[in-house]
Amino acid sequence: MMGGNMNKMMKQVQKMQQDMAKMQEELGNRTVETTAGGGVVKVVASGKQEIISITIKPEAVDPDDVEMLQDLLITAVNDALRQSQEMVAKEMGKLTGGLNIPGLF
């Protein structure tokens, strides 16, 4: 009797692994977009927490105030990465039933 339960559990684990691999691939193709400075800096990040693009409008480039542009970039990049992590956590939570399993993504 125990063998049947073990086989069933192993099949469930394998299915969850397959579902997770599929979700990771799908999330890698999804993106989040954020802006800073009223839209003068735009950052797009993937579900893999990789920066896809950074767009800077010309009015953000002031040779006398490079620090402002640097601050806008840091803000936008950090926000994009945070949003990407939240997107991944939300989607993985659906798959794992809310269980927080370290190292999933």
UniProtKB/Swiss-Prot annotation:
Domain of life: Bacteria
Gene3D superfamilies: Nucleoid-associated protein YbaB-like domain
UniProt keyword terms in alphabetical order: Cytoplasm, DNA-binding
Gene Ontology cellular component list: bacterial nucleoid; cytosol
Main location: cytoplasm
Keyword Cytoplasm found: yes
Subcellular location: Cytoplasm, Nucleoid
One MF term in the entry's GO annotations: DNA binding
Subunit structure and binding partners: Homodimer.
Annotated family: Belongs to the YbaB/EbfC family.
Family matches, as PANTHER family: NUCLEOID-ASSOCIATED PROTEIN YBAB
Role noted for this protein: Binds to DNA and alters its conformation. May be involved in regulation of gene expression, nucleoid organization and DNA protection.
This protein's name: Nucleoid-associated protein Dred_0043
Organism: Desulforamulus reducens (strain ATCC BAA-1160 / DSM 100696 / MI-1)
UniProt lineage: Bacteria, Bacillati, Bacillota, Clostridia, Eubacteriales
